[in-house]
Design a protein with these regions (language model features):
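Conserved alpha/beta-hydrolase
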Residues: 111-128
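Catalytic-loop region of hydrolases
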Residues: 24-116, 420-422, 427-436
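Short beta-strand/loop motif that positions the catalytic acidic residue
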Residues: 378-380
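A catalytic-pocket lid/entrance helix-loop region that shapes and gates access to the active site
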Residues: 186-243
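Alpha/beta-hydrolase fold nucleophile elbow
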Residues: 159-169
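Short glycine-enriched nucleophile-adjacent loop
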Residues: 172-183
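Alpha/beta-hydrolase active-site loop
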Residues: 138-157
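Alpha/beta-hydrolase fold active-site neighborhood
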Residues: 242-357
Length: 436
């Protein structure tokens, strides 16, 4: 057995080692050579891809504060998937970390539809693009847009055909903001499910959930579940506390209050991700069934000190805005007296709890969209609570198009629509790509 195993190991090595040596000895491609000659780019490494002929990850040197170069620099991660120098380029303005784009099977929708190169930019202060030391003062939307501007102007030395900016959720917001601040950097913008919030607790999401998503019967079923989980708090809170303890979660507020906020978050999470209503347990279900569903929809790490999104919470408090909770239907059963200003109290560390929301970004984007008509397509889901603060209010625009998928969630994409609508969107983008 040992001899057989040794032989198999040597046989595998005999095959793999020459392959690895051949790869190491392979001359650099034209793209590699041109990448190496670009300014501010370093640490270029090839990656495996099932969808693109060539794929690389590299870092680009960025200013922490473009208006004050003396503040220093950081390195931002970029993933480049290459189709051809004669093809258009899709710029993904990611709002978070870039980990998922490193997967060999990753392929962005627009890049696939239009056979385009793909430039995926990780957001500053996320993933491997975290400055050291971490100074939150430099985490601003404007600074992030200068990051994109530097990436785009640098890579346009390689790709001189049309550019499409796109992103999902916070990435979609970034696409919209980028077009506002640097309107000529790209030719087309396609933000997916992108909210434009006007305050820390915008105020449009709560009535949207209460009155507009799905049907009255389905909304009532979701609300009844929330009420039942609150009514059974004496039985379920110990299960909740053990669940959080086992996961290693800690919180800035008492566990009974965390429970309340998790219940309030339930309806937003349910509709955001399009969970089928028939998955909601009946109110006479046993405790275990209720609790299992509750945790499946609303993972409490969202409110914990271990939350994976501290950078986002800072931005929401400063510029991006967020949503509030309507406690009126549940007030009788809640430990908390009010949910107002919960992001500061629950989701920010004490040293950042005094952050003030600045409406400048919102006002600038609204003004830009009203006064201009860039080539943009907005994609939204009809049941997604973020659509409440989406850009669905523009009128009399020739170029800006808004598509809302009835019943759609935060996962809505072009491919989610019916065939006729998909063709309409693709035809419009193709026309823009082919315009001189």
């Amino acid at each position: 057995m040992k001899h057989t195993l040794s032989f198999m190991v040597w046989a595998i090595l005999a095959v793999l080692l020459p392959l690895q040596m051949a790869q190491a000895a392979a001359p650099p491609t034209e793209l590699q050579k041109r990448l190496q000659n670009l300014p501010d780019i370093s640490d270029i490494k090839p990656m495996q891809s099932d969808a693109y002929p060539e794929k690389y990850v590299f870092f680009i040197n960025q200013l922490l504060d473009p208006h004050h170069p003396e503040a220093g620099n950081f390195k931002q991660r970029v993933i480049l998937s290459h189709v051809g120098f004669d093809r258009p380029t899709v710029l993904v303005t990611e709002g978070y970390a870039a980990h998922y784009a490193t997967h060999p099977r990753y392929q962005e929708e627009l890049s696939k539809l239009f056979n385009a190169n793909l430039v995926f930019v990780e957001y500053r202060y996320f993933g491997e693009s975290m400055p050291k030391p971490c100074n939150w003062d430099y985490l601003t939307v404007e600074n992030s847009l200068y990051d994109l501007h530097h990436v785009t102007t640098t890579l346009k030395q390689l790709y001189d055909q049309k550019w499409i900016a796109t992103g999902i959720s916070k990435g979609g917001q970034t696409t919209m903001f980028y077009r506002t601040y640097f309107p000529d950097d790209v030719d087309i913008s396609v933000p997916y499910v992108a909210p434009l919030n006007k305050s820390l607790e915008d105020g449009r999401h709560e009535p949207f959930i209460a009155n507009k998503v799905s049907t009255p019967e389905n909304r009532k079923r979701a609300e009844n579940f929330q009420l039942e989980v609150l009514k059974r708090k004496n039985q379920l809170l110990p299960m909740f506390e053990k669940y959080c303890s086992d996961k290693g979660y800690t919180f800035r507020i008492p566990i009974a209050e965390v429970y309340d906020f998790n219940v309030l978050e339930y309806s937003f999470a349910l509709w955001q991700w399009g969970t089928p209503v028939n998955k909601i347990p009946e109110t006479d279900a046993d405790d275990h069934t209720l609790f299992k569903h509750f945790m499946a929809i609303c993972e409490p790490d969202y409110f914990s000190e271990q939350s994976p999104y501290p950078s986002f919470n800072v931005q929401a408090a400063k510029e991006l805005g967020y949503y509030g909770y309507d406690i009126k239907p549940f007030k009788k059963y809640l430990t908390i007296k009010s949910s107002r200003d919960y992001l500061h109290k629950v989701m920010l560390p004490p040293e950042l709890s005094n952050l003030k929301f600045d409406k400048t970004l919102y006002n600038k984007v609204v003004k830009f969209l009203k006064e201009n008509d860039p080539e943009m397509i907005y994609i939204y889901g009809g049941n997604d609570p973020w659509t409440a603060s989406g850009v669905t209010w523009l009128k009399n625009k020739k170029n800006i198009k808004v598509y809302v998928l009835p019943g759609g969630s935060h996962t809505t994409r072009i491919g989610s629509f019916d065939t006729d609508t998909q063709e309409k969107i693709k035809t419009q983008i193709n026309a823009w790509l082919n315009k001189e």
